[in-house]
Design a protein with these regions (language model features):
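Intrinsically disordered, low-complexity Pro/Gly/Ser/Thr-rich segments with frequent PxxP/GP/PP motifs
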Residues: 1-37
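Short beta-strand elements
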Residues: 30-69
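Hydrophobic/aromatic-rich core segments of domains that either
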Residues: 147-224
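Amphipathic alpha-helical scaffolding segments
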Residues: 20-22, 39-43, 170-173
Length: 225
């Protein structure tokens, strides 16, 4: 097979979308037997390409192992102890959806305490997808879009051992999480009934959350969000 040598340092330096062409040539010293050009778009390191092409790549911006999350998780643990007397971020070990929901509520409050302001998406010259503020930038800059906040919450939830969900609709994003130790078999689903069935009264296998309710000055409770 053909071994393409890609330079990681080149890609990580890209701050804007870059369009180019890959030229494939099959030849010997005298003759060209085949030549074809293929357009290629290189996205910036913080750019998601949108739902049209490999939408599952959005999950690459969920960063549960980032050290910047430690402070948020520690605060969530403290809140959990205040509420229940048990500070353990024990994920699904209790086999109790209400315990999982309590952990998610504590995380919600911990992020609210960060006083993050809502803002519009970062400017991008590309018309596909969106520029994403990574979790460390959201926490340090105190700014975030609905997508940025959803990714931050999902990153923290996964760091807690939970299974978050990202939900994308026209012009908006929000976040969810499994209340039981489950996942969907596929990385991407476009059937909304898969969520409505699992969030229905009496089922409560999945919870959905409006992430912008965590922004500064917003007094919306976790249950309302």
């Amino acid at each position: 097979g053909l071994n393409l040598m890609l330079d990681p340092s080149f890609f990580i330096q890209q701050t804007e979308r870059l369009s180019g062409t890959i030229v494939l040539v099959v030849s010997d010293e005298e003759n060209v037997f085949f030549q074809e050009k293929y357009p290629v778009d290189i996205l910036a390191f913080d750019q998601w390409g949108g739902i049209q092409v490999l939408p599952e790549l959005l999950s690459a911006f969920v960063v549960p192992n980032h050290p910047v999350l430690t402070g948020v998780l520690s605060r969530a643990s403290s809140i959990l102890k205040e509420w229940s007397g048990n500070s353990s971020l024990d994920a699904y070990q209790s086999c109790n959806p209400n315990r999982v929901k309590l952990q998610l509520a504590a995380l919600y409050e911990a992020i609210k305490e960060q006083h993050i302001a809502y803002c519009t998406p970062p400017s991008s010259f590309g018309d596909a997808g969106q520029r994403v503020r990574l979790s460390d930038n959201v926490l340090s800059g105190k700014l975030g879009t609905c997508l940025d906040l959803s990714l931050l919450y999902a990153s923290c939830a996964e760091a807690m051992g939970l299974h978050p969900l990202l939900v994308i609709i026209q012009g908006h994003a929000f976040v969810g999480c499994w209340l039981i130790d489950g996942t969907f078999p596929d990385a991407v689903n476009d059937d909304p009934s898969l969520l409505t069935k699992r969030t229905a009264d009496g089922i409560n296998e999945v919870i959905l959350l409006e992430a912008t309710c965590m922004t500064d000055g917003n007094n919306v409770t976790f249950d309302t969000a």
